[in-house]
Amino acid sequence: MPQLIPFYFMNQLTYGLLLITVLLILFSQFFLPMILRLYVSRLFISKL
């Protein structure tokens, strides 16, 4: 059914953008501060 092809692509685009925003929020709120804290603590320990 060729009538449904644009809706399929819009659906895919919507869920793709939603997934990207959720991943971006998760990384910026949780994972990146943990990695940064680990890096800073390693730097601090190596300076001692």
UniProtKB/Swiss-Prot annotation:
GO terms for biological process: proton motive force-driven ATP synthesis. F-type ATPases have 2 components, CF(1) - the catalytic core - and CF(0) - the membrane proton channel. One of its GO terms (molecular function) is proton-transporting ATP synthase activity, rotational mechanism. It holds the Pfam family Fun_ATP-synt_8. Its main location: mitochondrion. The chain crosses the membrane at residues 12-32. It is a single-pass membrane protein. It comes from the Eukaryota. It comes from Candida glabrata (strain ATCC 2001 / BCRC 20586 / JCM 3761 / NBRC 0622 / NRRL Y-65 / CBS 138) (Yeast). It is found in: Mitochondrion membrane. This is ATP synthase protein 8. Mitochondrial membrane ATP synthase (F(1)F(0) ATP synthase or Complex V) produces ATP from ADP in the presence of a proton gradient across the membrane which is generated by electron transport complexes of the respiratory chain. F-type ATPases consist of two structural domains, F(1) - containing the extramembraneous catalytic core and F(0) - containing the membrane proton channel, linked together by a central stalk and a peripheral stalk. During catalysis, ATP synthesis in the catalytic domain of F(1) is coupled via a rotary mechanism of the central stalk subunits to proton translocation. Belongs to the ATPase protein 8 family. Keywords: ATP synthesis, CF(0), Hydrogen ion transport, Ion transport, Membrane, Mitochondrion, Transmembrane, Transmembrane helix, Transport. GO terms for cellular component: mitochondrial inner membrane; proton-transporting ATP synthase complex.
